[in-house]
């Protein structure tokens, strides 16, 4: 199974790149984790946010692999603690499909992305900065994998 993070935004600070890469390089060969970035729409004083969201959603869904399970990262999603996420990871592996996790831009996800999702995951009831979410998702999934693989990274 391959994990794909599809995220709005292409210019992340160095600390985001460093943190994200630190975790994704730890994943085993049979579970590669890749990042696909889509450009954020130009936002300004008179920007049509609905159209920007719509376009970002089109780009995100076009980046998702055919047949992939789509999981959105969204505040109203299900809050999974670490053991629950490990269980989700196991179920995704048993399903046999690749998984695409979608992170929206500053205004969130397009309705088309939410509609295409089979699941929605809430990292926190807090509004988190989108760059930070990339690192949190990578670490959380690595920790979940470590539980399923009996790797010593996660400690109770």
Curated annotation (Swiss-Prot):
This is Ribosomal RNA large subunit methyltransferase H. Specifically methylates the pseudouridine at position 1915 (m3Psi1915) in 23S rRNA. S-adenosyl-L-methionine binds at residues 73, 104, 123-128. Belongs to the RNA methyltransferase RlmH family. It catalyses: pseudouridine(1915) in 23S rRNA + S-adenosyl-L-methionine = N(3)-methylpseudouridine(1915) in 23S rRNA + S-adenosyl-L-homocysteine + H(+). Keywords: Cytoplasm, Methyltransferase, rRNA processing, S-adenosyl-L-methionine, Transferase. The lineage of its organism: Bacteria, Pseudomonadati, Pseudomonadota, Gammaproteobacteria, Enterobacterales. InterPro entries: Alpha/beta_knot_MTases, RlmH-like, tRNA_m1G_MTases_N. Pfam families: SPOUT_MTase.
